[in-house]
């Protein structure tokens, strides 16, 4: 049957299943929060600018590998672009993460106003350390939920430098 504009989509889950899924998702995130925060702080400390994020990439890849993801580095001939994959088949779910620092944005961590630590040094003033690890958190949560429900599908998580 062809769908018509304004027609309600098919419901994939009953409401109770959805609520249980949300609760399970938060539980999975909570279990990994310390590890995710540590990775974010470590990436903050590296503050590597575009296409030089070797240490930051290793931090993220190590967590992905420990969680059972297959990791492929050097995507599109960019040495610090990488992908973590879990599962196979369809649908393919993609999540994008960034993790580069910006030149001249060095500042003290946790401050509510800019406090320069090293004048002119690179830093994560735009929060890409958190964007990268938030994507990591979403990937792990998705993997854990999918595994419990035995859902098929491929989860491709892309982290792009620069």
Language-model features: where?
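Acidic/His- and Gly-rich active-site-bordering loop/insert found
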Residues: 21-124, 133-154
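Divalent metal-dependent hydrolysis catalytic cores, especially in the metallo-beta-lactamase
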Residues: 152-162
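Short, Lys/Arg-enriched N-terminal segments with co-localized hydrophobic residues
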Residues: 1-19
